[in-house]
Amino acid sequence: MDSKESLTPGKEENPSSVLTQERGNVMDFCKILRGGATLKVSVSSTSLAAASQSDSKQQRLLVDFPKGSVSNAQQPDLSKAVSLSMGLYMGETETKVMGNDLGFPQQGQISLSSGETDLQLLEESIANLNRSTSVPENPKSSASSSVSAAPKEKEFPKTHSDVSSEQQNLKGQTGTNGGNAKLCTADQSTFDILQDLEFSSGSPGKETNQSPWRSDLLIDENCLLSPLAGEEDSFLLEGNSNEDCKPLILPDTKPKIKDNGDLVLSSSSNVTLPQVKTEKEDFIELCTPGVIKQEKLSTVYCQASFPGANIIGNKMSAISIHGVSTSGGQMYHYDMNTASLSQQQDQKPIFNVIPPIPVGSENWNRCQGSGDDNLTSLGTLNFPGRTVFSNGYSSPSMRPDVSSPPSSSSTATTGPPPKLCLVCSDEASGCHYGVLTCGSCKVFFKRAVEGQHNYLCAGRNDCIIDKIRRKNCPACRYRKCLQAGMNLEARKTKKKIKGIQQATTGVSQETSENPANKTIVPATLPQLTPTLVSLLEVIEPEVLYAGYDSTVPDSTWRIMTTLNMLGGRQVIAAVKWAKAIPGFRNLHLDDQMTLLQYSWMFLMAFALGWRSYRQASSNLLCFAPDLIINEQRMTLPCMYDQCKHMLYVSSELHRLQVSYEEYLCMKTLLLLSSVPKDGLKSQELFDEIRMTYIKELGKAIVKREGNSSQNWQRFYQLTKLLDSMHEVVENLLNYCFQTFLDKTMSIEFPEMLAEIITNQLPKYSNGNIRKLLFHQK
């Protein structure tokens, strides 16, 4: 039928919207243009799918257009002759239709008296309309126009008019050419351009207080418009995923409206791939043919917690993209319904399926197939107990290009502990001179032996030798090297052993062809383990200084007091020496104390005789390097008798020409020369240790004399000297006890020595001492 338009000039209206009871809708656009035309149109529409069937009065609407949207110059408007019942948007992209009736602003009043001009404009608008309906519009602009062109039913009720009256009005206005401006067929009451959207005709009438064209039905809380485009337009939801990764929804769905007004996406059986790759403002379509393979899977229900999810609903097709290639030859593989999510090396996924949260099931509440109603589990997207990463991998170890670094703690715990130097406790570099030592101690020991340095300790020969303080005292460091068993001969012996082994290997290879020949093995191999004598050399105390001032005139009291102070320090050194003797600390602690209390005078007297023998040829008593008792000092009161007993020891050592090894063994036997009458708590072990050092004395004699008949004779002489030491020590102890008890002499005793004498006096007075002699008197 022919649509009729009644356009009458009107006065300038208030820019605000005014509702009137007149027939028709009036739109005023004169606020910006300082003029304008009031359009009063009576329209009858019966076939609009979204129109209401109830009758209501028409209301008047005044709409303001933005400033500058229409030029003030007189220009031909191709859209002014279009029927206002179309609800069609033909203006600029930013203009939105707000009512059923449409008016376009002009500078002057719009008049339809000139029929030819209006008819020509009407024909041009019809041609433009046909072209616009045939060419697909931009999804965004189409959606905006569709939403904007929807008037609210409550504010703008559906208008009814007589068809014949409308035709007569149109003929009266347009003249004879009005019949050529038919926009609809004869059986249509209105021109419906939204019939392709398949809106239900009954839906507007079910809710009388709402309009089917309300934009809030199509706009979510975040003002996201649903792209209501054609069948080939893709739909996309903007989720809360990463900024450069947007969820991709396949173009196998199109919007449909149910009776209740909800939009539904129905899966399409025939999927047509677009032939171009388009990138628009709100979404990105991957449409490269032959690159993306979309597999037909059953539709699933997936509810995601991102904005705009309610505009499409819960029904959508499962996403499965395989082999997405890029221009650089990179490949991606995604499948939400498979059990594995794999990715090639050094690739970044196009979109983010799972937000980076601990549990993926919070965003995917349910997943159910719509075809056979079978539950499809997304177990691969939810790994309990593991951290879910944004790229879909449960942990970095699942990626083929990521290798977990080895744990340093496990390597440190499982590896063998580092070997330490036996001298300074630093990390050992190997076995040097028969002992596991570091390189620094190796060089130090070699220089100390080859250079024949005479190191002296400034302290008490008990300096701490470790990695930091090993250079503080070379004397204690050298003593500790010897105590550990370092020996220059061990290196030479090792070389000899290697030479013997190589020679033996060569001879065995030459004689291996003859089975009668036997492998030549050396009869004796040098002993690499340190001997007891070598250990005794290491633990021998250093020579102590008395600190005697020779510039002051000598006196018996002064010399005796100095000797007591020196004796106290020597006793402390003797205790340390005894504890270092191999086997001594295996004895009971009480036995160790008893042996030291009985033998402390033996040790000091024998050591004094050795120093006197080595330094003064047995003519002088060398107590210390700074305190030597010569013949002049021996003439002092109470000095000669005591010095005479001590000179006997040095003279015997000089007569027998005792070697250093023999001296060390004899000194150790003097430590074990006196025991209580009741015996020791570790008596058997004591006897075994004593016999061991007696044998060591025999070995030292053999080493000095060789295999001769004089070995037994020398052994007799040395053991006879050990027995004579008991008489010498007994005389010295008697004088020491006398001076200790006689307070009138005012001779000072150090604390250590005074304690030993106090414990030893009752034992000597009671006769609770048993002398261990080698020979019977």
UniProtKB/Swiss-Prot annotation:
Chain residue ranges for the region called Interaction with CRY1: 532-697
DNA-binding region: 421-486
Per UniProt, location of the Glycyl lysine isopeptide (Lys-Gly) (interchain with G-Cter in SUMO2) cross-link in this chain: 258, 277, 293
Keywords attached to this entry: Acetylation, Chromatin regulator, Chromosome, Cytoplasm, Cytoskeleton, DNA-binding, Isopeptide bond, Lipid-binding, Metal-binding, Methylation, Mitochondrion, Nucleus, Phosphoprotein, Receptor, Steroid-binding, Transcription, Transcription regulation, Ubl conjugation, Zinc, Zinc-finger
Region listing for Hinge, in residue ranges: 487-523
Sequence segments annotated as region (Modulating): 1-420
Modification after translation (UniProt): Acetylation by CLOCK reduces its binding to glucocorticoid response elements and its transcriptional activity. Increased proteasome-mediated degradation in response to glucocorticoids.
Domain NR LBD: 524-758
GO aspect biological process, one term: cellular response to steroid hormone stimulus
Entry remark concerning the domains of this protein: Composed of three domains: a modulating N-terminal domain, a DNA-binding domain and a C-terminal ligand-binding domain. The ligand-binding domain is required for correct chromosome segregation during mitosis although ligand binding is not required.
N6-acetyllysine: modified positions: 480, 492, 494-495
Residues covered by region (Interaction with CLOCK): 485-777
Protein name, as recorded: Glucocorticoid receptor
Record's function text: Receptor for glucocorticoids (GC). Has a dual mode of action: as a transcription factor that binds to glucocorticoid response elements (GRE), both for nuclear and mitochondrial DNA, and as a modulator of other transcription factors. Affects inflammatory responses, cellular proliferation and differentiation in target tissues. Involved in chromatin remodeling. Plays a role in rapid mRNA degradation by binding to the 5' UTR of target mRNAs and interacting with PNRC2 in a ligand-dependent manner which recruits the RNA helicase UPF1 and the mRNA-decapping enzyme DCP1A, leading to RNA decay.
Family, similarity comment: Belongs to the nuclear hormone receptor family. NR3 subfamily.
Isomerase keyword on record: no
Subcellular location: Cytoplasm; Nucleus; Mitochondrion; Cytoplasm, Cytoskeleton, Spindle
Basic and acidic residues bias locations: 1-14, 151-163
Comp. bias (Low complexity): 134-150, 394-414
Annotated spans, Disordered: 1-22, 130-183, 394-415
InterPro entries in the record: Glcrtcd_rcpt, NHR-like_dom_sf, Nucl_hrmn_rcpt_lig-bd, Nuclear_hormone_rcpt_NR3, Nuclear_hrmn_rcpt, Znf_hrmn_rcpt, Znf_NHR/GATA
A single GO cellular-component term on record: chromosome
Cross-link (Glycyl lysine isopeptide (Lys-Gly) (interchain with G-Cter in ubiquitin)): 419
Residues annotated with Omega-N-methylarginine modification: 23
Entry-linked PANTHER family: KNIRPS-RELATED PROTEIN-RELATED (PTHR48092)
Chain positions found as Phosphothreonine: 8
